[in-house]
Amino acid sequence: MKVLALRHSVAQVYADTQVYTHDDTKDNYENAFLISNLTTHNILYLNYSTKTLEILNKSGIAAVEIQSLEELFTLIRCNFTYDYENNIIYLHDYSYYTNNEIRTDQHWVTKTDIEEYLLPGWKLTYVGYNGSDTRGHYNFSFTCQNAATDDDLIIEYIYSEALDFQNFMLKKIKERMTTSLPIARLSNRVFRDKLFPSLRKKYQHIVNVGPRNESMFTFLNFPSIKQFSNGPYLVKDTIKLKQERWLGKRVSQFDIGQYKNMMNVITTVYYYYNLYQKKPIIYMVGSAPSYWIYDVKQYSDFTFETWDPLDTPYSSIHHKELFFEKDVAKLRDNSILYIDIRTDRRNADWREWRKTVEEQTISNLKLAYQYLASGKSKVCCVKMTAMDLELPISAKLLHHPTTEIRSEFYLLLDIWDISNVKRFIPKGVLYSFINNIITENVFIQPPFKIKTSKNEYIVALYALSNDFNDRMNVINLINNQKQSLITVRINNTFKDEPKVGFKNIYDWTFLPTDFNTTDSIITSYDGCLGIFGLSISLASKPTGNNHLFILNGTDKYYKLDQFANHTGISRRSHQIRFSESATSYSGYIFRDLSNNNFNLIGTNIENSVSGHVYNALIYYRYNYSFDLKRWIYLHSIEKADIEGGKYYEHAPIELIYACRSAKEFALLQDDLTVLRYANEIERYIHKVYSITYADDPNYFIGIKFKHIPYKYDVKIPHLTFGVLFISDNMIPDVTRIIKDMKKELFEMDVTTSYTYMLSDGTYVANISGVLSTYFKMYNLFYKNQITFGQSRMFIPHITLSFSSRKTVRIETVKLKIDSIYLRKIRGDTVFDMSE
């Protein structure tokens, strides 16, 4: 949802939009809670409070102040990610298709012939990093840019088997126009760009697990972050390959040679980072015009020094000349060298050309060895061709996509490789590598060993759920790592499946109860965004590809109502009960009935079950931004840091009742996942709360009324306001609590409406209006370690007779309390209190 804050109402009516006017009788937190549970996507928030907007944004719900109709129209028609700390909005708006254009934020693409393969009459527009060049389109009170581009489709095309670019793009654009927006993927770059600078300020040692090409620009500014990926393809790994011939397959209709060069250099940079944790000078021989240098410099400041007879316009220092062996001495330490020398074929026949290429390959390799043989802190990436070669077994083979699969591949070498054992690799084996293997990731660092690290902050986004990881190792890492941000796939199945298929692999599934943590926030993507200064207009949907975001060691842990809080907890319930259910009271009715409380009069006002916990369980797929376990735990140890005003603290028994209702709901829905989740949450409540039951009580609290509107034959009709199991020396503590609650007890709005047979031989009158006070008293007794209440639900009633009588219904009557007392069962009154 998105909240657009206005000072005045607007005449225009918008679809899927609701107006909320700030309620001055409620505090900012309650207003935020009410807004978050509205069911439309767009909320026009009138007479707004900036504090309420802050609360919503911290909760991950985008809430923006609007100063003009132009701002309103722009934000209401599309989704966006909001950097609420810096007041920057990143639109995810593809309406530019109506201008017959596709967009890119990679400059090199604009220098290709891609426009020849677009839809008829369409053009390509460069919009800068994350759409920064579009800022000039919006003259708004906040900074605004459109981060939507088609780079994801262009890159997907490059790695796909498709060759016809126009048909590929047409299909993908149609898919984009007919399916739900993958909002998390679109905003992920914004998130990463906010996350890692934030972590870098706090933590000296950061580990990042499983980065992909989408992150290749983000980490250029963080050479000290230790990356873990799937490891490199080594020369020695070719032993598994069978020999093949030249394939000559075209990969892309438009020229992607620059993309290949960019990927080679960035791969080399990250390999260098892994060895030396600092930025290198980048030397490049050949590969002009290297327009992609512009893209790299948009993200991070590097020195590029290049040699090529052709112009290289974005190089820091360009030598418009050939590079020779003698020039190697000019190259300094703390550098990488990219050798991409290849003479043009011109009119040479293939035999003559093949001889030239092989000679050049040997020459290139010699340059690489010469560069690495002296000095320190060096890495080299060199162009090679498929031919009979002796290569170091530890050298890394690269084959990033290029326009055609021919004879070309690249070799990545460090200073240790050149002194390592060499192996003869036949030409046919290298052709097999070229024909069958694509380097899909610029990150070729070794795999992560799933174990805790005492002095490092571990980030593992979408990296550890794969079933080739041991599930218990992942759980143990999350349980024991002191500082981390780790995601795992949430169990969205209805049959409690332990793993689910994703693309061509399987992922383990998890619930929050799989983890035994007491210093972690477990939330959703949008809940995590709020913690790092971002919010989003489109919440996570239960697609089956959703992840739990688990933060260990965050300073936000105790701020219970600010981050990963209960905002939106009832939104799914509202959507269902106001549109599909038998009555809008269905949730209240079901919760009472499933706990054998059959007095439904005023059930929506006085419910015996925690609606928070119930909704958090049965609709966890929709509202798991709320960290239920943390909420339970912090209340159990009385360390919840509550900033808001009015805040209702549940008694632990209310939470148990909610679990019982959720379990019955799950059985009716045949939802085995909710059934397990509710059982495990109930066990967790019993674990963190020391709940004892007065199932064999020796004292009770009685409430006597001035007048009872029914006939009775018991001696003193009274409301048993809870039973206790206490020793006599605890009586002063019990009476103190009763006295402390005197005002609230006598101010209870106690009513009765009918009589009924509670059991065979027990005729009673119903009582309403006392439950909230009962649960408050329960909490006070619990905190004083006094056993109060039974394991079965408290059903307030007045016993009228121990014989069978017919039910009597009357107009609701308010009962006036005469006295409240503490009496020993089958004994004397030990305390009596009148108003």
From Swiss-Prot:
Chain segments carrying region N7-methyltransferase activity: 171-245, 429-555
Residues of the active site are: H718, T720, H797, T799
Where in or outside the cell is it found?
Virion
Q: Which CDD domains match?
A: capping_2-OMTase_Rotavirus (cd20757)
One example GO MF annotation: mRNA guanylyltransferase activity
Q: Which GO terms describe its cellular component?
A: viral nucleocapsid
| 2'-O-methyltransferase activity: annotated segments | 246-428
Q: Does GTP-binding count among this protein's keywords?
A: yes
Q: Which UniProt keywords apply?
A: GTP-binding, Host-virus interaction, Hydrolase, Inhibition of host innate immune response by virus, Methyltransferase, mRNA capping, mRNA processing, Multifunctional enzyme, Nucleotide-binding, Nucleotidyltransferase, RNA-binding, S-adenosyl-L-methionine, Transferase, Viral immunoevasion, Virion
Record-listed E.C. numbers: 3.1.4.-, 2.7.7.50, 2.1.1.56
Region span, GTase/RTPase activity: 556-692
Q: Name one GO biological process term.
A: symbiont-mediated suppression of host innate immune response
Q: Annotated region 2'-5'-phosphodiesterase activity: where?
A: 693-835
Can the keyword Protein biosynthesis be found in this entry's annotation?
no
The reaction(s) annotated as catalysed by this protein in its Swiss-Prot or TrEMBL entry are: a 5'-end diphospho-ribonucleoside in mRNA + GTP + H(+) = a 5'-end (5'-triphosphoguanosine)-ribonucleoside in mRNA + diphosphate; a 5'-end (5'-triphosphoguanosine)-ribonucleoside in mRNA + S-adenosyl-L-methionine = a 5'-end (N(7)-methyl 5'-triphosphoguanosine)-ribonucleoside in mRNA + S-adenosyl-L-homocysteine; 5'-triphosphoadenylyl-(2'->5')-adenylyl-(2'->5')-adenosine + 2 H2O = 2 AMP + ATP + 2 H(+)
Self-association and partners: Interacts with VP1. Interacts with VP2.
As for family, the record states: Belongs to the rotavirus VP3 family.
Domain comment (free text): Contains a bipartite N7-methyltransferase domain, a 2'-O-methyltransferase domain and a GTase/RTPase domain. The C-terminus contains a phosphodiesterase domain that degrades the 5'-triphosphorylated, 2'-5' linked adenylate oligomers produced by the host cell in response to IFN stimulation.
Q: What does this protein do?
A: Multifunctional enzyme involved in mRNA capping. Catalyzes the formation of the 5' cap structure on the viral plus-strand transcripts. Specifically binds to GTP and displays guanylyltransferase and methyltransferase activities. Has affinity for ssRNA but not for dsRNA. Capping activity is non-specific and caps RNAs that initiate with either a G or an A residue. Together with VP1 polymerase, forms a VP1-VP3 complex positioned near the channels situated at each of the five-fold vertices of the core.
Q: Which HAMAP family match?
A: Rota_VP3 (MF_04124), Rota_VP3_A (MF_04128)
What is this protein identified as? Protein VP3
Query: What organism, scientifically named, is this protein from?
Result: Rotavirus A (isolate RVA/Monkey/United States/TUCH/2003/G3P[24])
